[in-house]
């Protein structure tokens, strides 16, 4: 399929979810299943022998873990809610959709898979520590927070990987046929993006009342961080000839997890930042697909 058609489909999905957000938000319960299928078909084309941890991950880990808390401590001097939202936009781990996007862009899918597994594990431990020092009404015990986050992340990441590995071992013929239809992951992603866009818009409209200055700052901050993280990842990745993959490491965020963490552990309004990030990262991905055509 030509890249310009992919770009048009993604933009159409964003517009459709935005316009008919009330309708598509009703299907949010199907998002985990869609993400599971999306990863399953993406993993069918991955050579798991190439999944390994690389030295270039270290600086990216330091950025996400270190800069996120540093920015939080600086911004909280102005406003706690804004600080939490900004921190989530940096701390949020790589989205599973980054694996699909990487394959569309011709990036190193195994590399993105490796970093995604690593950063999701790290964040599941680090995030509860950070949440414990924040100004929140109800502090959830550390190990309970870790358990909740791990249960939210890893079934979607690990189970499809184990399933694909099992198929590769048991039936090479089935594995070969599945590899030929990995394009299905893109179509599933389009459906998932439409639902996510609708759910996000619905959430933003419901939360979007009260302190309008903070709301605007959350949305603008998400835009600035989205552009910065894609660019930082891209130019950092050039050192290792892996720029498209590195851009996905940092730029494509697991916003579903970030929104859930905000609503579960932090001030609910801070979730507007990762919610807005959904919109911006989809526009960036549309631009990347268009540029690659």
What residue spans do the PLM features occupy?
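Alpha-helical transmembrane segments of multi-pass small-molecule/ion transporters
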Residues: 1-293
